[in-house]
């Protein structure tokens, strides 16, 4: 019996500082695709967030969609935010599952009626303890995970004030809402970064260290230099591809 090939679109929203030397490690789609379970056949495709996604990519052409993180502010009325928000709703209406990560989670929350704003405490970075809510324990996105686990974070905006129909799945201390799921079970968001590892997060942050040191209330270098891997991220991506992506 032939194995079904699942088509997954990665919407790459990462913005790199100008003037960086080429580096193959800055492959955002690869950060996600490397965790594909061996038992699944997945064809990965990447599209930049600034492309005209509503005209170029019909949701019907995909079995699943992942929205990457980004330094963009999901709470602004930037045209990129507006068009991607519209596309998220089109995916839901077409029955296509979507996983939003960090910025993707925030934008998803916004278009579903939640509040998104800068966190008054500023930046959350590095290893972060979180725990599942009752709704999170019931979600297949978190199959195989304990009630409490560590994740890797990199954000200063947060989702809050969830409307009816938007469920809180993962909780944290600094950012209370670390995961959401809509009433259809198609749209899932996580504030943290399941795709990343310490090396990748340092790759992102090394060009930004000097700028951010005076902005934060903790030892930025100590946090970045002593991050530990978080295997929970791989499990969450496995679960999304296995349980939700159409096959």
Describe these PLM feature segments.
Residues 1-94, 220-247:
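N-terminal beta1-alpha1 cap of cysteine-dependent amidohydrolase-like domains
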Residues 68-139:
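Cysteine-nucleophile active-site neighborhood
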Residues 20-21, 54, 76-77, 109-111, ...:
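Short glycine-/acidic-enriched loop or helix-start segments at secondary-structure transitions
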Residues 112-199:
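Pocket-forming structural segment of enzyme catalytic cores
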Residues 9-11, 43-45, 66, 99, ...:
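Hydrophobic/aromatic beta-strand patches that form the interior of the parallel beta-sheet core
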Residues 23-26, 59, 79-83, 112-116, ...:
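Short, glycine/charged-enriched secondary-structure capping and boundary segments
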Residues 167-171, 175-247:
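C-terminal and late-domain segments of enzyme folds
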């Amino acid at each position: 019996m032939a194995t079904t090939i699942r088509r997954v679109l990665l919407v790459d929203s990462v913005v790199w500082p100008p003037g960086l030397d080429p580096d193959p490690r800055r492959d955002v789609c690869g950060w996600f695709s490397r965790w594909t379970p061996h038992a699944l056949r997945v064809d990965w495709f990447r599209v930049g967030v600034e492309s005209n996604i509503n005209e170029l990519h019909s949701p019907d052409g995909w079995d699943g969609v992942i929205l990457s993180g980004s330094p963009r502010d999901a709470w602004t009325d930037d045209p990129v935010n507006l068009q991607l928000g519209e596309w998220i709703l089109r995916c839901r209406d077409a029955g296509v599952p979507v996983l939003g990560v960090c910025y993707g989670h925030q934008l998803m929350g916004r278009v579903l009626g939640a509040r998104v704003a800068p966190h008054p405490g500023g930046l959350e970075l590095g290893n972060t303890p979180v725990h599942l809510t009752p709704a999170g324990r019931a979600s297949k996105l978190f199959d195989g995970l304990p009630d409490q686990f560590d994740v890797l974070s990199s954000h200063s905006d947060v989702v809050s004030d969830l409307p009816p129909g938007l469920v809180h799945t993962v909780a944290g201390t600094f950012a209370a809402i670390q995961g959401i799921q809509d009433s259809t079970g198609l749209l899932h968001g996580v504030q943290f970064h399941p795709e990343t590892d310490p090396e990748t997060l340092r790759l992102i942050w090394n060009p930004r260290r000097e700028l951010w040191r005076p902005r934060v209330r903790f030892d930025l270098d100590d946090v970045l230099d002593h991050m530990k891997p978080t295997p929970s991220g791989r499990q969450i991506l496995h679960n999304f591809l296995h349980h939700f992506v159409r096959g």
